[in-house]
Structure formats: C-alpha cells, structure tokens
C-alpha cells in the first residue's frame, strides 16, 4: 500500500500545556488506524489537527505529499480530501436529512444538485435511512443521526475519513448500528483514522492500533499484538480497565 497521510513531529500546545508532543505517523491507502488512550491524552485534538481545525505549533501534515497545515497553507484543496465525523453529529437542525447531506457537495464542490441527490439517496439507502430523507434531525435517534453524519462525510468523496468517538454519545443499543456501518467501510478498503473507546470494535476493524498517552505514541501494533501481547506496562494497565473480574 502507498502512503497517503504523513505526520511529522506534530506538536500542539494550549498556552503552556503540551497536548501533542512530536507525533510521527505514516498511514497507507486503505489502512484503518485506530487510536485509543485515556481521556485527555490528545486523541481528539490529534484528529482536529489533521483536519485543520486546530493550528499546530510545530511539525507538518502531508496528504498525498501536499502540506495541509492550516498555519502554512490557506484554502488548500487537499484539505477537502479529509472527511470528519464528530461525536456530536453537527447536523443542521432546520434542514431535512436529505438537505443536510446534499448541502456541502452542491455549495462547496459546485456539483449538480440532481446528481448529488441521487448519490445521497443511494448512500442513505445503504445505511438504512432512505425512508427518513424528509425528516429533521430532531425526529431521529442518536444512532440514526450519526449514520447521517457518516453519509454526509462520504458524499464529499474523502480520501481519508476521520472518526472521532462517534459512539460516545449513543445509548448502548444504538452503538452497534453505527459500528456496523464503519466496519463495512473498512472492508471496502477505505482509509480511516478512528478514535474510540469501543475495544471489541477496535480489534475487529483495525489494521493497526495506536496507544496515545500524555501526547505521545506509547505503543502501536497489529490488533493481535496490541491486545494479546502488550509490551509496555502503561498499555497493560490501560487495557485492564476494560476487563472486570470479581
């Protein structure tokens, strides 16, 4: 697989607090990288830095060899190749589901509305929501809203999809319906960087696991290596928090 996303010495600070401390990472086309770690370790901030939602103090982010740091490049078309799905859905409450999905490709990419509508309907059908196309977000469950958010990202044809704790705000019964969609995307060979606390899902979907703590990559490996044979005491301790023994 060819490299699609490269991160070199990425450093992010909030005032004097170092949130990301010299992160280096290479992601290949079709690879699914899952990032886990304790709360406050910098996982979500890392995704926001990749997508240009946060400025960085040092380092660079390259997509297909092009620098996409927001502090160095303005209005870079390469940044449109990164799609992001947030924990909070971020749907427009005053627009229907279909309008939420079709707005960006028509307004931003200047695509024909009829063409976009047909693609949107096909994507909504794929995630089991075509019957909800004329509904408003307030009429949907949390799991349904998150599936709409995934469709809204996919219709922009991103080369890399960033998923930030997309099940964290969902009731347990709704988690599976969202994770099944993501798992199907992984099996298609889509490139994804996923932040999650769902360890069973991470093991099933990941090509590579990364453990982030204190703004640094502490350990990485295949899911089998990561879960069955962790090398560092810190990762062992972290994984133990997900097991319960009387």
Describe these PLM feature segments:
Residues 2-223:
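ABC family nucleotide-binding domain
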Residues 220, 224-246:
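C-terminal boundary and immediately downstream tail of ABC-type ATPase nucleotide-binding domains
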């Amino acid at each position: 697989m060819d490299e699609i996303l490269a991160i070199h010495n990425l450093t992010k600070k909030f005032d004097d607090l170092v949130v990301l401390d010299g992160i280096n990472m290479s992601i290949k086309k079709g690879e699914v990288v899952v990032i886990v770690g304790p709360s406050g370790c910098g996982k979500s901030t890392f995704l926001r830095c990749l997508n240009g939602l946060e400025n960085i103090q040092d380092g660079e982010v390259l997509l297909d060899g092009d620098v996409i740091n927001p502090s160095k490049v303005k209005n870079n078309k390469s940044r449109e190749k990164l799609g992001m799905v947030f924990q909070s859905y971020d749907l427009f409450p005053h627009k229907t589901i279909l309008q939420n999905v079709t707005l960006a490709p028509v307004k931003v990419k200047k695509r024909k509305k009829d063409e976009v509508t047909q693609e949107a309907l096909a994507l909504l059908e794929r995630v089991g929501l075509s019957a909800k196309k004329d509904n408003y977000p307030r009429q949907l469950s949390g799991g349904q809203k998150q599936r709409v958010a995934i469709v809204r990202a996919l219709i922009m044809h991103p080369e890399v999809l960033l998923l930030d704790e997309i099940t964290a705000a969902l009731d347990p019964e709704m988690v599976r319906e969202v994770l099944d969609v993501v798992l199907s995307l992984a099996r298609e060979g889509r490139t994804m960087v996923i932040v999650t606390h769902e360890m069973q899902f991470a093991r099933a979907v990941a090509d590579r696991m990364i453990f982030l703590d204190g703004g640094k990559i502490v350990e990485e490996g295949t899911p089998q290596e990561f879960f069955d044979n962790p090398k560092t005491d810190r990762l062992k301790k972290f994984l133990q928090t997900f097991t319960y023994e009387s």
